[in-house]
Amino acid sequence: MKKTLLFGAISAILANVAIADELDPLSAAQRHQQAYEYREQQANINYNNSPALHLNNGDEANVPNYAGQFHKTLPHAANGTVNSAAYQQLLTAIQAGSFTAFEQVPAGGPVKLANPLAAQVYDLEGRDSHDYGMKPAPALGSAEAAAEMVEVYAQALLRDVPFSEYTSNANVMKAANALAILTDFTGPTSAELLFRGIFEGDQTGPYISQFLYKDIPAGPKVVDQKYTRYKAGENFMTTPSEWLAIENGQMPSKSVNTQTARYMLTGRDLSRYVHQDYTYQAYQNAALILLSWGPSVWDDGNPYKTATRQGAFIDLGAAEILDTVAKAGNAALRAAWFQKWNVHRRLRPEEYGGLAQNNPGLLHAQFNSSIVLNHVQAKYGNKLLPMGYPEGAPTHPAYPAGHASISGACVTVLKAFFKEDATIPSPVQPSANGSALEPIADVLTIGGELNKLASNISLGRDWAGVHYRSDGTEGMLLGEEVGIAILKDWRDAHPQAPALTLKKFDGQEIQI
């Protein structure tokens, strides 16, 4: 009996010590309950935002032989027409949404489809990937699609012209004139601003964002942004046999040649960067650069900016900013993958180029009569799109661009955490040969250069010939919505109730 009483007394003492050691506004049970209620609340908030109505451009039903759709890696006839039964089996697999169904899709070669089942993954932060909406992609025979392809062909012809020479290069001026006469072109048409984005900051200062030129403080090492470049003048898929093999899913028979590293000077340089970057690389680098500039460039809604006894780190500091950038990027990819595979299935520019060669009657007259198409015909003996990569486009549909969707999400996160109207310290541009950086007098803002970074990464894919302008513009807007949704969930989890602000791509200022 005495022994039992003794152990009971010891247990009571230990219990009291445990309670005394737990310095927390809530008991463990209360915290456990509130964590559940928070998650339930956020789920309800996101659930009450009704899912979008998903509509495509109708080409799949209205254009013969699925000519307006993505069908790379499926079997094709000699003229590039996809095997209809194989395409219908792809549609069956998409509808089924199962691993087994995709394994049964007929193949024209060993190259695999790029992860179509990713469209079915659920999200635990922000809204579900299927909730976000997009407008339909430009229809195959439309004037807008024609204008976009004229631009992509012009970029293919001008890959090696330095951005700094645009106002003096005769071929750039011809391309600008060719785009200016198109009725539905949505990009800039002056030689100075050719192939730039359309958002605030895109058309100010050098073509390339400061966040792709500035040194990166990567932990104990400072990394410059000189990158090896692809050999000038080297293009791919310019013969019908090479083009058809790639469309069937054969491995490329050629490879790229690289040259000495330099700062980016040309469209080809930019296309090389977005060929081998990891998903959120450019935005992680931008975050590291911004963090190195200190609290003066933090958003004014960050309470730690003026705190005297507390510093930001795990929340509202480097750890959380870097994590949120990566998190937003992957969520944006899932949203893009749903739109690509389950809604639009838009053909890639190289497939459009195949139609230019084999079935031009399906295309708009403004494309078929363009001077840029004549230049390609004269140079290569056919109308196929000269590609920047040996393998051409990735094996997933064009609309929206994955790179652009990541851009929109990650840049939105960065614009929330940092002060957009703060100026970039000591702006630079590359020397004529790209070996060094030189100071410039332009007044550039963080927000403008982040927008430009997003557009650079998006348009860099166009420079390679793997995307159209609207893939990028609309992809960035999709990514922006993903980023905002994640930030709203993030905000409600914080005891400080931070009130960060950002300016959307359309210029609207919002508070998270």
Residue ranges and their predicted role:
Residues M1-A20:
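Gram-negative bacterial Sec-dependent N-terminal signal peptides
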Residues D21-R469, T473-I512:
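Hydrophobic alpha-helical bundle signature of multipass membrane enzymes
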